[in-house]
């Protein structure tokens, strides 16, 4: 029986773009009986509103060709200089799960991994889903992921440690999501459920045969 996986792209990407950048990963997942779904973030804001340190990501990750703004799961909060997850993202993912799920796992890259990690603290509760609509997740994978930093989210992580089996992928040359940020999300998971996997590259989802084989081995250990 095919199992569905929810794939959350990074800042300024789209579902189609993320799919094109994860062909090798997707091929290996399909061999294991998984079907990958790539939604596109519902929020769009002007490139000028994006922090300077994310410029490299935007330049290397164009949208779907129809959007002139930057697609994102999160929105900037000008009053604090931080960010927040808007209700539009929650509502969109709620409906997406109902229409395309249920999902066995969730995989995120960069901002998508941050969102996936936050949702993994209480996937059904945060998205307003019953266990009939969405059974408990079987796994969670974060590539260049991070724990939300704004203060209003800390209680959620502290009261609901991520207990879903999780794989945290960190690039040794990643200058966008620093090791400390990856470690922050990793430390938000229970000790017996988390695994850290390094790769020699930067800020991207590796597609090499060696990497996807390690992911496959991790998934097979869960069954």
UniProtKB/Swiss-Prot annotation:
GO molecular-function terms, A-Z: carboxylic ester hydrolase activity; hydrolase activity
E.C. no: 3.1.-.-
InterPro entries named in the record: AB_hydrolase_fold, FSH-like_dom, LovG
Major location (coarse): cytoplasm
Key words of the record: Cytoplasm, Hydrolase, Serine esterase
Compartments (UniProt record): Cytoplasm
Coiled coil: none
GO cellular component term, pick one: cytoplasm
Other facts: Present with 1070 molecules/cell in log phase SD medium.
Family: Belongs to the AB hydrolase 3 family.
The protein's name in its UniProt record: Family of serine hydrolases 2
Name of encoding gene: FSH2
